[in-house]
Amino acid sequence: MAAIPSSGSLVATHDYYRRRLGSTSSNSSCGSVDYSGEVIPHHPGLPKSDPGHWWASFFFGKPTHPVMTTVSESPENSGSFRITSGLVPCGLVQESVLKQKVGDTKSDSSPSA
């Protein structure tokens, strides 16, 4: 079984891969500007990214799709939808328009009193 270090965390808090051993850097993992120590040159085979945040693209990468909007079903009419903000996916718009047109033709064709 692996032992947990006394610091209680397995997350790297220093940029060891960027500095030569023996350099003194701050304990901050936020990519502070004042590093002392020799910078190791970037390997040409590796992708370049923001300093200190190479892992961020795995969790907070740029979205490939537009941001989805919140669509909620109206409690009083179980068939109607309310769009709160943003873009609407094309399929949802077409489906909503078709349902609306079918509902309008039914209400128009019914005899009025």
Swiss-Prot record:
Instruction: Give a Pfam family name.
Output: PPDFL
What keywords were assigned to this record?
Answer: Developmental protein, Differentiation
Keyword Kinase assigned to the entry: answer is: no
- InterPro entries recorded: PPDPF
Q: Which GO terms describe its biological process?
A: cell differentiation
What is the similarity comment for this entry?
A: Belongs to the PPDPF family.
- Say what the protein does: Probable regulator of exocrine pancreas development.
Q: What is this protein called?
A: Pancreatic progenitor cell differentiation and proliferation factor B
Source organism lineage? Eukaryota, Metazoa, Chordata, Craniata, Vertebrata
Gene name of the encoded protein: ppdpf-b
